[in-house]
Amino acid sequence: MAVAIEAPFHVLAVDDSLPDRKLIERLLKTSSFQVTTVDSGSKALEFLGLHDHEDSPISTQSDQQEVAVNLIITDYCMPGMTGYDLLKKIKESSYLRDIPVVIMSSDNIPSRINRCLEEGADEFFLKPVRLSDMSKLKPHILKSRCKEHYQQEQNLQSNSESNNSSNPTSENSSSSTSSNSHKRKAVDEEILPHTIRPRHS
């Protein structure tokens, strides 16, 4: 009997520093995550299938994303699009907002950390990231999965209730049509004997 093997969680790691990207990739793989690395926020959005200025998936890019991204971990300080900017893009998108996002930074600046957490970041790691930090990722992925499944169940239930509420109307309509047909038949049968009665001279 074949045993189903659960696919590893897929993490998208974003960092403009090659040494830091290599480090986070190694830590994630050691922790049994599947990893994709990119060196900028714009490339991260491209991989996710989202333009910098759009809120919908790009059909031409979506094919390259062969597996769903379960979590995004990004550096804060990057040229062009910062990790904070990337976080905002993700949380503003109805398509991506439920993906957990973790921010990394070499600077321990409370105001920066609070701003990211208020914007929707799930964790804020100080660099250098350690192997022990990886254990904090899975709970966020599982929480996101549970939320996703709950929303799917709610949608299915809503669709089911919508279908059920529309059926009685058609049944009542059919029943009403049938009832009217019987009434007309009864009236015709009542009238018919009088119309064919012969006249007496």
Curated annotation (Swiss-Prot):
CDD domains: REC_typeA_ARR
Region (Disordered): 149-201
InterPro entries named among the record's database cross-references: ARR-like (IPR045279), CheY-like_superfamily (IPR011006), Sig_transdc_resp-reg_receiver (IPR001789)
Residues where 4-aspartylphosphate is found: 75
All residue ranges annotated as the Response regulatory domain in the record: 10-142
Biological process, per Gene Ontology: cytokinin-activated signaling pathway; phosphorelay signal transduction system; response to cytokinin
Keywords from the UniProt entry: Cytokinin signaling pathway, Phosphoprotein, Transcription, Transcription regulation, Two-component regulatory system
Induction: By cytokinin.
Entry-linked SMART domains: REC
Task of the protein: Functions as a response regulator involved in His-to-Asp phosphorelay signal transduction system. Phosphorylation of the Asp residue in the receiver domain activates the ability of the protein to promote the transcription of target genes. Type-A response regulators seem to act as negative regulators of the cytokinin signaling.
Official protein name in the record: Two-component response regulator ORR9
Organism: Oryza sativa subsp. indica (Rice)
Originating gene: RR9
